[in-house]
């Protein structure tokens, strides 16, 4: 993320997301609620963060994220690929990793297989954004003959 905080700065919601605090949408909500400060002043939607900025979230300092995390996880059936803690079967609580991570893409609850999780938004963008034109391949096993 340090390469993103340059002379032009980056938007506060992206800074918080890249720092592993929350998603950009969640950041916008926290900013509107007054829970984010930049240099001691309440942040506004669209505020920019610079290298010398001091950012706090709920009174705690937020710095440039530490080590980037990328986890390859063999998701079992019954686990939901969501960060929503209200879902008792969510993948984040199941893995219980000490740093905020989120899934790259998703697998259905009844599916099992490889899913990647990370705290690095640039990896997510590189994999999921359509402009990068990645081919997706799925291997499916069925329990009866396909006739059509």
Predicted segments — roles?
Residues 2-148:
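Basic, flexible Lys/Arg- and Gly-enriched helix-loop patches that mediate nucleic-acid binding at interfaces
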